[in-house]
Amino acid sequence: MFARGSRRRRSGRAPPEAEDPDRGQPCNSCREQCPGFLLHGWRKICQHCKCPREEHAVHAVPVDLERIMCRLISDFQRHSISDDDSGCASEEYAWVPPGLKPEQVYQFFSCLPEDKVPYVNSPGEKYRIKQLLHQLPPHDSEAQYCTALEEEEKKELRAFSQQRKRENLGRGIVRIFPVTITGAICEECGKQIGGGDIAVFASRAGLGACWHPQCFVCTTCQELLVDLIYFYHVGKVYCGRHHAECLRPRCQACDEIIFSPECTEAEGRHWHMDHFCCFECEASLGGQRYVMRQSRPHCCACYEARHAEYCDGCGEHIGLDQGQMAYEGQHWHASDRCFCCSRCGRALLGRPFLPRRGLIFCSRACSLGSEPTAPGPSRRSWSAGPVTAPLAASTASFSAVKGASETTTKGTSTELAPATGPEEPSRFLRGAPHRHSMPELGLRSVPEPPPESPGQPNLRPDDSAFGRQSTPRVSFRDPLVSEGGPRRTLSAPPAQRRRPRSPPPRAPSRRRHHHHNHHHHHNRHPSRRRHYQCDAGSGSDSESCSSSPSSSSSESSEDDGFFLGERIPLPPHLCRPMPAQDTAMETFNSPSLSLPRDSRAGMPRQARDKNCIVA
């Protein structure tokens, strides 16, 4: 797949050190760590700090870049209908938009951030130079700034550059929006540009297209388009760098556009065939194992020597083929020998742990220095408490544990939990009103926790101490590389969550149920017929039977004679002695209450028409 090409490209022409005006300039990113800018032989970066040229303190626009900019503008004016001149510097600003009066120049720059206004000898001027080098790379237009190109590639580069200038290149025009016009909509933010406001117009985008000055940015990098130079492509404006990448791939090593018929593609990025090499030692990685770090490939030897972590358990390097556990800058081998309690040596893989003073412990007792005790029936286990947090996407959240000795420790867990599972049962039944637990209404009663002896320390942490807002996280990393291909990250299995405990079966109700004729009730109320089924695992009581359709808690959906699933007792004057065969438990064919025919026939009409309401 990765055929090793000629090394001629990497040994191509590089400008002599005496010709580079930026040699020795300090790096704005690395500060004192970089001794000064020294151009790499074929990469467009510094040999010392590996940062690009624009990250160093370039005090003035390079002469070659100014010449290229002038050529770009002249070509654009030749191919466009605009006769606007280029921007020129003033005593106060390093660059100003062309064709504006002094008060309009001030109005334009007042719309930009203060640190991006190009005052002379200011951070804004340095920002402009940096954006010129980054947005308009010279090697995208001129073959002389490329490391080494074949004759056919030079022809393609010239044709590529001319086509971009002819079809896409443009320069924004700044002017005051006419007051007589109601206004327009900014192409970037969608807000209105009123009459009298200053706006940027782009002729390539059409006559009505305009932007706020602070909104005239590149679509890809969202940076201000330097000197209002843009490239219009498929309805969007780009800087020169990202517009070229829309048309051709760019080599991640030499930063040049790839015109060769073959290239190397790995992890969504592109390289010249002979540029896919180690970033440190430049050894070819064609068909070899490699590790991608910050979009730069490294061979295994260089990565382990420069970027591998040390295990806090055994002190050895964590190899590329070994998994590791990481927490707040600490790293361990993902093994029981290294990732274990610092006091008792208990393995902590898949278990909660307490980090304290750079060490990890299995319990608060071990972290305080007391003798560890095995979890028993009388002692709460850490894995059963709320300390356990789900491990999602190879990451487990940490929770804070408040100790009894006024010292705050943190508890975390590496236990795995399912991605989806049943939620903990609520203390109130679904469909029942939210009130205190009342067994006579069919609600679950919450068992009181057993009292703890005063002498025994409370090892169970507070529930409020384990919030999900905790920032520390523990992560598990699988081996980075695999033989014969790019690295593949393996996701950890979903975390395991405790199953909710099923409620204990209720004792059978001692209330007598009256037998009734359900056939007569179904004839009177044909719309209220429901099918009931009994839960075989919860006893034979009528409270354990549930209807297949979901019932509502409102009174309108309750059946006659029932309230919250319970039978309404009859008034004393309606109760009559019943035969012995009628004292059996009523059947589940009808959910509503109905009286026997003989009792209904003997009662007055007023009593039969009344409904019992329980307040």
UniProtKB/Swiss-Prot annotation:
Ranges of Polar residues composition bias in the record: 405-415
Alphabetical list of InterPro entries matching this protein: LIM1_prickle, LIM2_prickle, LIM3_prickle, PET_domain, PET_prickle, Pk/Esn/Tes, Znf_LIM
Keyword vocabulary terms for this entry: Cell membrane, Cilium biogenesis/degradation, Cytoplasm, Developmental protein, Disease variant, Leber hereditary optic neuropathy, LIM domain, Membrane, Metal-binding, Mitochondrion, Phosphoprotein, Primary mitochondrial disease, Repeat, Zinc
One protein family per Pfam: PET
SMART domains: LIM
Superkingdom, natural source: Eukaryota
Domain PET: 74-182
Comp. bias regions, Basic and acidic residues: 606-615
One CC-aspect GO term: plasma membrane
Disease per record: Leber hereditary optic neuropathy, modifier: A form of Leber hereditary optic neuropathy, a mitochondrial disease resulting in bilateral painless loss of central vision due to selective degeneration of the retinal ganglion cells and their axons. The disorder shows incomplete penetrance and male predominance. Leber hereditary optic neuropathy is maternally inherited in most case and results from primary mitochondrial DNA mutations affecting the respiratory chain complexes. Mutations in modifier genes can influence disease expression.
Subunit record text: Interacts with VANGL2 via its C-terminus. The VANGL2-dependent membrane recruitment of PRICKLE3 is a prerequisite for its polarization. Interacts with WTIP. WTIP is involved in the recruitment of PRICKLE3 to the basal body. Interacts with MT-ATP8, a component of the mitochondrial complex V.
Name the record gives this protein: Prickle planar cell polarity protein 3
Gene (name only): PRICKLE3
